[in-house]
Amino acid sequence: MDFINQTLFSKYTESNVDTIPYLLGLILALTNGSRILRFINSFIIICKHIVTTSKSAIDKMRKINNSEHNTKNAHEEYEEVMKQIREMRIHMTALFNSLHDDNVKWRMSESIRREKKHEMKMSDNRNEFKHSHNDTNICEKSGLETEVCL
């Protein structure tokens, strides 16, 4: 009876139904306890306990490895993000330097263009003044009779 209780009410923690011990327990009850069936049933129970123990040990190891892996993952992700930030900082610096250089070149070209335009206006004004000054007679324009005009 003790053997049947062990078989039918085994400590299988995973709450899965294992049919082999139940069938062997039923056959054992019907055959009045053969030694071979007892040995086979006890062997199966021992194997089942070993499997459940190893499963729980493997699960614990997986949890430990996952936590270490997650920690490593967090550090790796942090390093990756920092690397990307450094790369972006380099790219942004290069972009701003390029924009600054372009802006400086544009300002220089604008100032040169304005200066040339101003010089052209000044030279045009001088030329116009020279032409108008050479063509006109002061005496005729002023209407005054001066010693120079007489």
Swiss-Prot record:
Glycosylation sites: 5
InterPro entries: Rotavirus_NSP4 (IPR002107)
Membrane topology: Single-pass type III membrane protein
Any one GO BP annotation for this protein: monoatomic ion transmembrane transport
Membrane-side (Lumenal) residue stretches: 1-15
Main location: host cell
Disulfide bonds: none
Annotated TM spans: 16-44
Cytoplasmic-side segments: 45-150
Assembly notes: Homotetramer. Interacts with the immature particle in the viroplasm. Interacts with host CAV1, early and late in infection. Interacts with host integrin ITGA1/ITGB1 heterodimer. Interacts with host integrin ITGA2/ITGB1 heterodimer. Interaction with microtubules blocks trafficking to the Golgi apparatus.
Biological role: Plays an essential role in the virus replication cycle by acting as a viroporin. Creates a pore in the host endoplasmic reticulum and as a consequence releases Ca(2+) in the cytoplasm of infected cell. In turn, high levels of cytoplasmic calcium trigger membrane trafficking and transport of viral ER-associated proteins to viroplasms, sites of viral genome replication and immature particle assembly.
Protein name: Non-structural glycoprotein 4
Source species of the chain: Rotavirus C (isolate RVC/Human/United Kingdom/Bristol/1989) (RV-C)
Lineage: Viruses, Riboviria, Orthornavirae, Duplornaviricota, Resentoviricetes
